[in-house]
Amino acid sequence: MSTTDSIVSSQAKQSSWRKSDTTWTLGLFGTAIGAGVLFFPIRAGFGGLIPILLMLVLAYPIAFYCHRALARLCLSGSNPSGNITETVEEHFGKTGGVVITFLYFFAICPLLWIYGVTITNTFMTFWENQLQMPALNRGFVALFLLLLMAFVIWFGKDLMVKVMSYLVWPFIASLVLISLSLIPYWNSAVIDQVDLSNIELTGHDGILVTVWLGISIMVFSFNFSPIVSSFVVSKREEHEKEFGREFTERKCSQIISRASMLMVAVVMFFAFSCLFTLSPQNMADAKAQNIPVLSYLANHFASLSGTKSTFATVLEYGASIIALVAIFKSFFGHYLGTLEGLNGLVLKFGYKGDKTKVSMGKLNTISMIFIMGSTWVVAYANPNILDLIEAMGAPIIASLLCLLPMYAIRKAPSLAKYRGRLDNVFVTLIGLLTILNIVYKLF
């Protein structure tokens, strides 16, 4: 065999799919599938069949192109082991590092508030509807749940990290199983409501506005941006030295594409199954009640008259328990990120980044009190969760996931080769539409 043939054979072997590629595909997929998915069917099904079909068309491009853009930004740094903060500082200086620190903190903290509201509402509806117990004081319930989680986090963080990682796959399996099990309960209500002769495109309940608002919940639900930096560093260390950055970029894009396909398939099937089981009016009721779709399904099956099937009985109780586990998993993961982000801000601005000037134990305690206290205030106030996602959570995620990479592509020389592409226009448009939701919510 010639030298050229050997090189080609070696490259073909190395470029083949590895076990680590499968691990990262599932890791990206698992990061995105959390409590946010439980609200996607409500927003997606709120406007009926046509908007959710349009969202189905948009789902994969949003998931793939936006995360690929962020991955390309992470790949553009000169240090293969450098994370996104180091890369942004390399391109834009210390100011860029400060901006990314702020963005990370404010992208995660509102999500924690959202989960604080969600876990309170989910527990209360389970307590009152499934257990048939008298209503409890909302402030007490929120405080009890947050203190319980704070206790677990404080005394068993390492154990909980392992437990939560194991819960990802049972939760995903539960979503798929529920989606399949709902098929016998599908009905034609959502199809019957379609009137092609009287389609409203604009207006508050028009198709375009519904899809526009749906983009925000897709950005929120299809989001694995917190793990992209670690993913890219891992792949650069695995491939870049031997095969170069271009090969590494193609490998990262391939993994992100497959993870996005898996994510869209599971989430959209779950959303369609919920919509065909319920109706657009049921989705509107779920939004008004401010509860995730699994809690609404539990209440829906609890209200069925006559003899119930075994599945209906199991779902009546199991759906809320699955929702609580999913929310706790998401809350725990986002709490760690929020704590890290808040500590980073305090160290950067209060101690100029010098960890020796402060006790980390004391800093963790103060940060925990602030985080849990602010979460309790929001949980007690009980703002509408979808409105909170659309007005706060999704726009900040879009700033980090969509607009920051697009700005870097325009300004950073190492990203110049990606300029002038149509997918850049798409990612920028998704980011701007998501952020403009803030204006829509105000007016």
Curated annotation (Swiss-Prot):
<comment type="similarity">
    <text>Belongs to the amino acid/polyamine transporter 2 family. SdaC/TdcC subfamily.</text>
</comment>
<keyword id="KW-1133">Transmembrane helix</keyword>
<keyword id="KW-1003">Cell membrane</keyword>
<keyword id="KW-0997">Cell inner membrane</keyword>
<feature type="transmembrane region" description="Helical">
    <location>
        <begin position="259"/>
        <end position="279"/>
    </location>
</feature>
<dbReference type="Pfam" id="PF03222">
    <property type="entry name" value="Trp_Tyr_perm"/>
</dbReference>
<dbReference type="InterPro" id="IPR023726">
    <property type="entry name" value="Thr/Ser_transpt_TdcC"/>
</dbReference>
<protein>
    <recommendedName>
        <fullName>Threonine/serine transporter TdcC</fullName>
    </recommendedName>
</protein>
<feature type="transmembrane region" description="Helical">
    <location>
        <begin position="22"/>
        <end position="42"/>
    </location>
</feature>
<feature type="transmembrane region" description="Helical">
    <location>
        <begin position="366"/>
        <end position="386"/>
    </location>
</feature>
<feature type="transmembrane region" description="Helical">
    <location>
        <begin position="207"/>
        <end position="227"/>
    </location>
</feature>
<dbReference type="GO" id="GO:0015293">
    <property type="term" value="F:symporter activity"/>
</dbReference>
<dbReference type="GO" id="GO:0015565">
    <property type="term" value="F:threonine efflux transmembrane transporter activity"/>
</dbReference>
<feature type="transmembrane region" description="Helical">
    <location>
        <begin position="140"/>
        <end position="160"/>
    </location>
</feature>
<dbReference type="GO" id="GO:0015194">
    <property type="term" value="F:L-serine transmembrane transporter activity"/>
</dbReference>
<keyword id="KW-0769">Symport</keyword>
<dbReference type="InterPro" id="IPR004694">
    <property type="entry name" value="Hydroxy_aa_transpt"/>
</dbReference>
<dbReference type="GO" id="GO:0005886">
    <property type="term" value="C:plasma membrane"/>
</dbReference>
<feature type="transmembrane region" description="Helical">
    <location>
        <begin position="389"/>
        <end position="409"/>
    </location>
</feature>
<feature type="transmembrane region" description="Helical">
    <location>
        <begin position="163"/>
        <end position="183"/>
    </location>
</feature>
<keyword id="KW-0812">Transmembrane</keyword>
<keyword id="KW-0813">Transport</keyword>
<comment type="function">
    <text>Involved in the import of threonine and serine into the cell, with the concomitant import of a proton (symport system).</text>
</comment>
<feature type="transmembrane region" description="Helical">
    <location>
        <begin position="319"/>
        <end position="339"/>
    </location>
</feature>
<keyword id="KW-0029">Amino-acid transport</keyword>
<dbReference type="InterPro" id="IPR018227">
    <property type="entry name" value="Amino_acid_transport_2"/>
</dbReference>
<feature type="transmembrane region" description="Helical">
    <location>
        <begin position="423"/>
        <end position="443"/>
    </location>
</feature>
<feature type="transmembrane region" description="Helical">
    <location>
        <begin position="97"/>
        <end position="117"/>
    </location>
</feature>
<keyword id="KW-0472">Membrane</keyword>
<feature type="transmembrane region" description="Helical">
    <location>
        <begin position="44"/>
        <end position="64"/>
    </location>
</feature>
